[in-house]
């Protein structure tokens, strides 16, 4: 059994920060679960361009507010506590923090190894050896 707390992650290499978000990576590829599991904070009033070309992601909001815009059709979806969205088509998108920081619980398939950050196109590199959907 794997048991971890957020306090064990904060301040370690498994807490990755940018100007617009912080990702606390609780499960990674090395844990052998077939997915990675993260707590991500999107800062209030910020916008981030993301396009996970190599990963599928499911996200559940557990606090705060914001929105997500899909680039392909310009649709904007409000996000608040209790909202789930899944990027099942490698959707290019813009998560935006609202009036308060948005706290999200995220899973990635294939799992992240832990060192990934977005490149200039909003893409995480594929570092996992596991194929998408397996």
From Swiss-Prot:
It is an enzyme of class 4 (lyase). Pathway: Amine and polyamine biosynthesis; ectoine biosynthesis; L-ectoine from L-aspartate 4-semialdehyde: step 3/3. SUPFAM superfamilies: RmlC-like cupins. Induction: By osmotic stress. Keywords: Lyase, Stress response. It catalyses: (2S)-4-acetamido-2-aminobutanoate = L-ectoine + H2O. Its EC number is 4.2.1.108. GO terms for molecular function: ectoine synthase activity. GO terms for biological process: ectoine biosynthetic process. Transmembrane segments: none annotated. Belongs to the ectoine synthase family. Catalyzes the circularization of gamma-N-acetyl-alpha,gamma-diaminobutyric acid (ADABA) to ectoine (1,4,5,6-tetrahydro-2-methyl-4-pyrimidine carboxylic acid), which is an excellent osmoprotectant. This is L-ectoine synthase. It comes from Sporosarcina pasteurii. The lineage of its organism: Bacteria, Bacillati, Bacillota, Bacilli, Bacillales.
């Amino acid at each position: 059994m794997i048991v971890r707390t957020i306090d064990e992650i904060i301040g370690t290499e498994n807490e990755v920060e940018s100007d617009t978000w912080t990702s606390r990576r609780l499960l990674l590829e090395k844990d052998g679960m077939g997915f990675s599991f993260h707590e991500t904070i999107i800062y209030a009033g910020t916008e981030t361009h993301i396009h996970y070309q190599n990963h599928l992601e499911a996200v559940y909001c557990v606090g705060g507010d914001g929105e997500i815009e899909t680039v392909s059709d310009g649709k904007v979806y409000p996000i608040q506590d209790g909202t789930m969205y899944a990027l099942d088509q490698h959707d290019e998108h813009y998560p935006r923090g609202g009036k308060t920081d948005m706290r999200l619980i995220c899973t990635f398939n294939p799992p992240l190894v832990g060192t990934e950050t977005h490149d200039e196109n909003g893409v995480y590199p594929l570092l996992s050896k596991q194929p998408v959907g397996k």
